Structure formats: C-alpha cells, structure tokens
C-alpha cells in the first residue's frame, strides 16, 4: 500500500516537473507546440475576391457585397 502511494506521488511529481520545464524557448518559439496559448488568434491573411468572382458570403468579396442570385461579388 505504501509502495503504491509512493509510486503514484513520484509519477505525479515527475509529470508536474516536465510540464513546468516544457515552457522553454528556442529562438523565440516554444519547443512544445501543444503547450502554446490557444487564446491568440492564428489566422492566415485572407484575400478578398474582386467583382464578378464567385462568392458564398459578403465577407468573401472586397466590397463586402455578394449578389445571391448569381453568387458573384459586385
């Protein structure tokens, strides 16, 4: 019983040590990407579509207007 408790505490301690030391930086970036903050916004720059191009929503078009009849940017 005591040996089991000691083993469990040891495993928990080693896991906690690894998590706290995993936030080391290498050239300004995290070594472990899984531990990076997910609160920041990592979006690729979106290009808008010119008039006459196919669109599904107004946000696809540069002028923010998508004609629903023809599904084309205006």
Curated annotation (Swiss-Prot):
Q: Where does this protein reside within or beyond the cell?
A: Secreted
Listed transmembrane segments? none
| Keyword set includes Metal-binding | no
Q: What does the tissue specificity note say?
A: Expressed by the venom duct.
**Source organism (scientific name):** Conus miles
Keyword Phosphoprotein attributed: no
The entry's keywords: Cleavage on pair of basic residues, Disulfide bond, Knottin, Neurotoxin, Secreted, Signal, Toxin
Family designation: Belongs to the conotoxin O1 superfamily.
* Matching Pfam families: Conotoxin
- Source organism lineage? Eukaryota, Metazoa, Spiralia, Lophotrochozoa, Mollusca
Question: What are the cysteine partners in each disulfide bond?
Answer: 48-62, 55-66, 61-73
Output the Gene Ontology terms for molecular function.
Answer: ion channel inhibitor activity; toxin activity
- The protein in question is named Conotoxin MiK41
> Domain comment text?
The presence of a 'disulfide through disulfide knot' structurally defines this protein as a knottin. The cysteine framework is VI/VII (C-C-CC-C-C).
Q: Name one GO cellular component term.
A: extracellular region
Q: Where is the signal peptide?
A: 1-22
User: What InterPro entries does the entry give?
Assistant: Conotoxin
Q: Which residues form the propeptide?
A: 23-45
């Amino acid at each position: 019983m005591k040996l089991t408790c000691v083993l469990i505490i040891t495993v928990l301690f080693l896991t906690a040590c690894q998590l706290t030391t995993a936030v080391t930086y290498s050239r300004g970036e995290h070594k472990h990407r899984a531990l990076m903050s997910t609160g920041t916004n990592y979006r690729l720059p979106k290009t808008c579509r010119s008039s006459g191009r196919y669109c599904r929503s107004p946000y696809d078009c540069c002028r923010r207007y998508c004609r629903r009849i023809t599904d084309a940017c205006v």
